[in-house]
Structure formats: structure tokens, C-alpha cells
Swiss-Prot record:
BP terms from Gene Ontology: DNA recombination; DNA repair; DNA replication; viral DNA genome replication
Effect annotated for changing residue 232 to L: Binds 3-fold more tightly to ssDNA. Promotes strand-displacement DNA synthesis by viral DNA polymerase in the absence of the helicase
Residue ranges with Acidic residues bias: 214-232
Domain-level remarks: The acidic C-terminus is involved in modulating the ssDNA binding properties. It is also required for dimer formation and for interactions with the viral DNA polymerase and the helicase.
Quaternary structure, from the entry: Homodimer. Interacts (via C-terminus) with the viral DNA polymerase. Interacts with the viral helicase/primase. Part of the replicase complex that includes the DNA polymerase, host thioredoxin, the primase/helicase and the single-stranded DNA binding protein.
Segments forming a coiled coil: none
Record's protein name: Single-stranded DNA-binding protein
GO molecular function, one term: single-stranded DNA binding
Pfam families: SBB_T7 (PF21265)
HAMAP family documented for this protein: SSB_T7 (MF_04153)
Region called Disordered, residue ranges: 189-232
Region span, Dimerization and interaction with the viral DNA polymerase and helicase: 212-232
């Protein structure tokens, strides 16, 4: 079955976005993620009509999927080991929240790799990033908080488990970079502390280069690609 792809409104990336490269966590501190995760929290003005439609689409997807899951649970209750309590259906947090300041933040993510079911080989996923003209970028810059973005995404409902309640994952499919805000590295904070005859960095970060054109229109579209990433 084809997967429906949605396009977000223009929004502002929050800090700690992982778009150019995935986040692998910190294994030494006990929260490593060997599969890697691309992710971005995108804040959109509530006055943008698309913002409310995004909320409505997510809520509808969740309500329909949750109702079906509860019906299935009641019709076929899972077997429970003696002395154990059954895990009853419950709902989790939605992947968005109203900030109370006229904006809503949506949380998008996807895995950066998957295991081939036949070969058991790990396949890496390169997140597609396009420029404001819809051209795929070969060298994706580090995209910092404050960057203006649009994203393409799919809705992936998931059931409750012992860790989280039933909700919807906003599966990140691709990103349009409209306005870039990079990490300044705190250079302005050092303006008054210049040391003469010291080390001077040579060159600057590479500009992003367009590679090939990809359709990135405003309308929702259908994608036939299989969802290899799975749920969180």
C-alpha cells in the first residue's frame, strides 16, 4: 500500500537538529543508538492555516488507529502469565505541543539505517535535503536552530507498550532548507580577545551544492517506498 506523504508549513528549526548527520547518542553514558536518528523539532506559527491542518491530520490518524487497536485488544485479549498484570491500552503524548505563545512545535524523526531482511546487512539511509528551489543538495551544511525549513513526512501510528502509550510518529522523509542558520561557534564572544600572531583558521565551510532536481511541490503526494525505518 502506498504511503501518504505530507508537506509541513514553513517553520523554524529548534536547537539540536540532526539533519546533515544522524544522532548516534552517547553509548558511554548509556544512551547510544547504533542505528542513528535524523531528527528536527519544527516550530510553526499557529496563524498559518497549514499548522492547524497538520494537528488535525495527526489527531485523526491517532484516533482511528487507537480505536482499531483497542477493538482488537478487546476481541482478542493477549495471554498473560500467571501472577502478571495485563498491559491495558493507554495513550501517549502526541508528537506536537502548543507553546502558548502563538506557535506549535512538531517533532519529526527517522532512523538512519535498517537491516536488510534477506541479507541481514545494515543499510544506511541518507536523508534527502533540498534547497529552496527543490534541488537536492550534495554537501548538506550543519543546520542550526533558527533555520527556516519545510519537511515532508508520513504518519506512522503505533500501539502502546510498557515504555510508551499509543501515539503517532512523524516519520521524516525529506527536508527543504529555505534559510540557513549555522552554529556561530561563539566567535562574537571572542571579538575583544584577539591574540596577534596566533593560529588562524584557513578557509571556511563549504557552500552547499545542488546535485540533481527532485520534485518538491506544495501538494501532498503518494510514495511507494516501503517504511524500512519502523517505529520508535
Amino acid at each position: 500500500m502506498a504511503k501518504k506523504i505530507f508537506t509541513s508549513a514553513l517553520g523554524t528549526a529548534e536547537p539540536y537538529a540532526y539533519i546533515a548527520k544522524p544522532d548516534y547518542g552517547n553509548e558511554e553514558r548509556g544512551f547510544g543508538n547504533p542505528r542513528g536518528v535524523y531528527k528536527v523539532d519544527l516550530t510553526i506559527p499557529n496563524k498559518d492555516p497549514r499548522c492547524q491542518r497538520m494537528v488535525d491530520e495527526i489527531v485523526k490518524c491517532h484516533e482511528e488507529a487507537y480505536a482499531a487497536a483497542v477493538e482488537e485488544y478487546e476481541a482478542n485479549p493477549p495471554a498473560v502469565a500467571r501472577g502478571k498484570k495485563p498491559l491495558k491500552p493507554y495513550e501517549g503524548d502526541m508528537p506536537f505541543f502548543d507553546n502558548g505563545d502563538g506557535t506549535t512545535t512538531f517533532k519529526f524523526k527517522c532512523y538512519a539505517s535498517f537491516q536488510d531482511k534477506k541479507t541481514k546487512e545494515t543499510k544506511h539511509i541518507n536523508l534527502v535535503v533540498v534547497d529552496s528551489k527543490g534541488k537536492k543538495m550534495e554537501d548538506v551544511p550543519i543546520i542550526g536552530g533558527g533555520s527556516k525549513l519545510k519537511v515532508k513526512y508520513s504518519l506512522v501510528p503505533y500501539k502502546w507498550n510498557t515504555a510508551v502509550g499509543a501515539s503517532v510518529k512523524l516519520q521524516l522523509e525529506s527536508v527543504m532548507l529555505v534559510e540557513l542558520a549555522t552554529f556561530g561557534g561563539g566567535e562574537d564572544d571572542w571579538a575583544d580577545e584577539v591574540e596577534e600572531n596566533g593560529y588562524v583558521a584557513s578557509g571556511s565551510a563549504k557552500a552547499s551544492k545542488p546535485r540533481d532536481e527532485e520534485s518538491w511541490d506544495e501538494d501532498d503526494e503518494e510514495s511507494e517506498e516501503a517504511d524500512e525505518d519502523g517505529d520508535f
